[in-house]
Design a protein with these regions (language model features):
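Acidic, Ser/Thr/Gly/Pro-rich intrinsically disordered interaction regions
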Residues: 1-88, 92, 100-259
Length: 259
């Protein structure tokens, strides 16, 4: 059976996975060491962002352990379910990290009363908030606009619409006809109240399925399922970069204020 990822891609992911924990610890230390002026900003940084990034790192490690990227056999339902739980939590906390960083800035800069709650955020349409950031950070945030779009879509689907799940497997084009024939025969066996024949046909049909480590929510609402291992890594690295840039922004604002 063929693995979904090639060897080079697998090696790259394993390598990056090794740095998730040290990068998390480094970011935590930096945020804990930062001298916050506002107590709410400090709470959002220490108990919001810092806690979420730790959860995100753990979720990624769990998802990679439960369903490794090199998996070729369809994992058990329990394993798929456990991986889904971790991916759902990862998406929710990635979204939460971004939101927490926006609130850290708003409180630390004393903007909570002048910016409406609906305008607190880092996307292009959060105009009032974006105006308070440096041109350099605004430019960087512009490059993340499509990533923000994906994140909001997946988080909203998880929170309000169809939860994220890992399809148990797909059938290769050459096996489509055979799989459909077995599906029809399974239905006939059920109608004939013949559970043993149904189980036999189901086992036969499952042999045609190939595992693909993809995640999706609604087939009607999204263009195509997405490979979750590289996406989890990319999300983590984006949150880390954003966290470091926001820390730089806070430090620059504090320095300018003290002069």
């Amino acid at each position: 059976m063929k693995c979904y990822f090639d060897r080079k891609h697998l090696a790259q992911m394993r390598e990056t996975l090794q740095v998730v924990r040290p990068k998390t610890d480094n970011l935590l230390l930096k945020y804990v060491a930062h001298q916050f002026v506002d107590s709410r900003a400090k709470e959002y940084a220490h108990h919001g962002f810092a806690r979420r990034i730790q959860t995100l790192a753990r979720c990624i490690e769990n998802a990679f352990r439960i369903v490794p990227p090199g998996t070729v056999k369809i994992p058990s339902k329990n394993r798929l379910h456990d991986a889904q739980i971790n991916i759902q939590a990862a998406i929710g906390n990635t979204y939460g990290c971004v939101d927490n960083l926006a609130w850290v800035w708003v409180h630390e800069r004393g903007l909570a009363n002048s910016i409406d709650r609906q305008q607190v955020g880092l996307r292009k349409h959060h105009k009032k908030m974006r105006e308070t950031l440096s041109a350099e950070l605004r430019e960087y945030l512009d490059t993340l606009e499509s990533w923000f779009g994906y994140l909001v879509d997946y988080r909203d689907a998880f929170a309000h619409r169809i939860p994220l799940y890992i399809p148990p497997g797909g059938v290769r084009p050459k096996d489509h006809e055979r799989a459909k024939e077995l599906e029809d025969r399974k239905t006939a066996a059920l109608n004939a109240l013949n559970p043993y024949e149904y189980e036999r046909l189901d086992a036969e049909q499952m042999k045609l399925f190939v595992f693909q480590p993809l995640i999706c929510h609604s087939f009607n609402e999204m263009p195509a399922p997405m490979a979750f291992h590289p996406q989890l890594i990319a999300d983590f690295l984006t949150v880390e970069a954003l966290g470091l840039k926001m820390l730089g922004e806070l430090a620059a604002a504090t320095a300018a204020h003290s002069h």
